[in-house]
């Protein structure tokens, strides 16, 4: 599993005290680091604060305009502002302060909503940027009911697996497509399996599902396989741990093609993705996932 943490750098106090406080708030509610040796929440908070307060002297202030993005999470900040965690097309996950966004007559209130496609502009050179403009782009149907809960599950996955400021344009496009599919009423279990697979592959946690990694041979539909964490697909062995789900080659081929028309593919892909997500998160629970499991959508 790749280490998504960045190398440590000398710390310096942030030039913006608001950004500094926002980083502290964001860190206190940050998602646990997957490989933290100490308490996950403590480790995440420390790392977020370290990076938020870091200033790189040789780097000019970053200004980004009209970047496509979505709000993944928002923390209330002070009386009138928000700290946002957004997912953008060309910059990946970005933390930023939306000053005055909670004011009654702020134009940002209606724009900074979950699952709204928006054009974002920001400035800053630390971990926490300052939002300067946000415009609703439109073009997508709103989520409601079960689809809305599934959307929050997608957001939680992105928060867990995507490091900050690491662009994943393919994953961004797939996120948009997944929201569209959910808004049109496609079965959540099918749509979410597809997103989970792309997420693990795009973030480097998983490889191809239709090819044996060691031999390079294409998966055969009539044979049984396991997905060995850190290595990939291979034929089953008698010595395989009982916790590793056995899946048919047909299931793996179907997953690679986003085909969930077979009942066996639906059940086996569910077991496989539960196993992989549990492994790569080191057992850390996903809040929305448990709700969906209880509702039998996962």
UniProtKB/Swiss-Prot annotation:
Keyword check for DNA repair: yes
Alphabetical UniProt keywords: DNA damage, DNA recombination, DNA repair
GO cellular component, one term: bacterial nucleoid
Signal peptide (residue range): none
Function comment: Involved in DNA repair and RecF pathway recombination.
Stated family: Belongs to the RecO family.
Name of the protein described by the UniProt record: DNA repair protein RecO
Name of the encoding gene: recO
């Amino acid at each position: 599993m790749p280490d998504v943490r960045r190398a440590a750098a000398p710390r310096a106090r942030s030039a913006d005290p608001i950004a500094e406080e926002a980083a502290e708030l964001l860190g206190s509610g940050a998602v646990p680091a997957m490989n933290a040796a100490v308490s996950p929440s403590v480790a995440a908070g420390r790392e977020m604060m370290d990076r938020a307060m870091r200033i790189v002297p040789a780097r000019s202030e970053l200004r980004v305009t009209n970047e496509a993005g979505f709000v993944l999470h928002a923390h209330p900040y002070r009386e009138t502002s928000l700290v946002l965690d957004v997912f953008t097309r060309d910059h990946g996950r970005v933390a930023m302060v939306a000053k005055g966004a909670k004011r009654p007559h702020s134009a940002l209130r209606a724009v900074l909503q979950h699952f709204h496609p928006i054009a974002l502009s920001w400035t800053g050179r630390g971990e926490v940027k300052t939002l300067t403009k946000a415009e609703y782009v439109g073009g997508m149907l709103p989520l409601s009911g079960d689809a809305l809960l599934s959307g929050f599950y997608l957001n939680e996955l992105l928060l867990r697996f995507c490091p900050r400021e690491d662009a994943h344009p393919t994953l961004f496009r797939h996120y948009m497509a997944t929201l569209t599919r959910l808004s049109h009423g496609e079965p959540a279990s099918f749509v979410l399996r597809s997103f989970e697979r792309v997420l693990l592959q795009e973030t480097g946690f998983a490889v191809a599902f239709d090819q044996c990694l060691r031999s390079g041979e294409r998966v055969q539909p009539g044979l049984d396989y396991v997905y060995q964490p850190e290595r990939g697909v291979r034929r089953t062995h008698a010595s395989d741990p009982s916790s590793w789900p056995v899946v048919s080659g047909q299931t793996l081929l179907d997953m690679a093609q986003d085909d969930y028309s077979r009942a066996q593919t639906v059940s086996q892909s569910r077991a496989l993705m539960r196993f992989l997500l549990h492994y790569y998160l080191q057992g850390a629970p996903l809040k929305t996932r448990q709700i969906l499991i209880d509702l039998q959508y996962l």
